[in-house]
Amino acid sequence: MFLASVTNPSRRVGALAYLNHHLPKLAGKIPSDDIVNETGDYEKGENRTHDMTSALESVTSPEPGLLIRCFATGLADEQVLIQRNFLDLLVTHLPLHSSVLQRRVTSKDLELLVGAAVGVVIRRDMSLNRRLWAWLLGPDFDKSSHANDAGVHNSMSSSSAAMATFDNNSSKSHYFEQFGFKPLVSSVKSMLAKNSSNPNERSRPYRISLSLMDRWEVGGLVVPEVFLPVIRSTQRYKHIAKSKASFDEVFRSASAFFDGVESSLIFSELVGLILSPRSSISRPNRMMDDLRLATFMLSHFNMKEEEMLTTHIPLLILSLLLKAKALCTSSAWNEPGYSSVASSALDEIGSVANLLVRLVPERAFTPHPEKSRDSSMDNATTSMSNEQVTKAILNFYSRSKDSLRLPEPPFSSTGVATIILREAQSLVMLSLESDTQTQFLRERINLFVALLSKMQRAELPEPGKLYEAIEEKLTTANDGHSVLSMSVVNSAVFALTSLYSTKKSSRYISYEQITDLIPVLVQQLWDFLEPANLRFHVEAAACLWLLHSVSWRDHLVEAAITSVMISPSTSSHQAPLDQAEKFFVLWNHSHHSNTDSFALRTPSDDGPDIKTVYRANLLSQPLFNVLGLLSSGSEDTSLAVRDWLRDLPSTYE
């Protein structure tokens, strides 16, 4: 009969009628070693009669696999009526706590049955869902009405059998946790592991997981276990989807599931991906997979809930900076293979951090009057070590899992802002001081400046430290007559001009400090304008104009260029040919480039000729020096200048 129901859907109605009349109720108690019963009345199982034993044997021998498959196929039937009747049979004859399911069937068969049962939620039919919850959460039972029931020893109803396994403080949530939680989670994970390319099949476990959240007793336990597997499955499908339409269909289901999950759980998992020991450099493949998953999650799913923006994203930014610092300061940089893995991880961390900084609003770092903390607490926060900060973040998310309401964040809004700036500045310093970190300098300065723009009220620890590091790097190179890499010089120019141009710029860098470094920077940039060195011409010219944009009224860059062009070894005030050729490069790129974009910081009320004055303040004196070569230079030099003038456009706007 079981086989007929499994293999022939048309016979399931008849099989159901037979089962309703002849299937024994398999709701006996669990064997004594699993019973949690203070009275111990049922520990020996004396009430199992010979008739019940015979009935059980008749449907479960030689093994109960056929019984399970009969129910599984019935629960997956296309007809709602058949699904409903099989669910009724589960509730009345084969509850989750029955010894058949808990003792006699294999774990795979139990997963099969539970997976088939929860599959009915796809239909969104309330009558099916009610029966499913009754089966997963156990039958209702009023303990007081059965406390003195003398007949309970001889005939255990499914209600009393269920409650015999619990103490007086048991609940439906405990029932599900003990009997249904593990097989349900395993079943959903098995569905996710199938890696189907069909959009309908792929999204099925997502929709099931979403529907399970309708009951907190089930969803509250299952969702934390399947959340990351669902997101990983979605990430994998993006690479194997046959078309964008297929991925969009699957992503809609994944996105609906994601939107139903608590923000604290989402970010608890994200922080775990970054800070957890399982994602350490000792397991590089796992670490990179976790970082890529975090990137996918943050770039594809909705991250704009207020709690996410103001509480969780700042903590995640801080977690990323802590991870980057740990990778950079590791003693393993010189070990084979470490630097390449760490560099890839740092690139991924940088892209995620920049994505988050674009998302987070300024109000996330603005103190709230109703949540104000004592300034001494903020001072204590900013003096915490990285290990203490990491522990505080992990403890916060650990507590959030055990609480219905979000606990108090580990840091105030200004406190977390200050620590973020401290760590971001520390990473910039590492790039300046370490030869192995130079490649990340520009990216880290970009991030640091972007963070400063979002944290206007935060205090930067040791604000002069970054300027001092840049100054030392540049002056050491100039004193040693060495040329720094373009990435370092470019980053230094960007850092100085950006820090000076932020609101309340005097907090970070003064105009006097910039003027002190302009001659050194111009000297470095001028070497990149060699005619043969085509690679860096555009970048060097852009940097010179960027320096000019913050100092143009005082002609500082113009004076520095003029000084570099005039050879100190001669008494002549004319530029030699090699310096003139560098000026030709600067002039050409100044003419063809949009140099006006660097004048955005100039006042708009200085009259109609402001652009002309702005340009002239950089190019005039060096141009006069070059033109002087027409009369006082050597024949070759004069010829070179004439050729350059001849090739110039007839007008220069």
Cite the ranges covered by each PLM segment.
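Structural marker for long, regular alpha helices in very large eukaryotic proteins
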Residues: 1-653
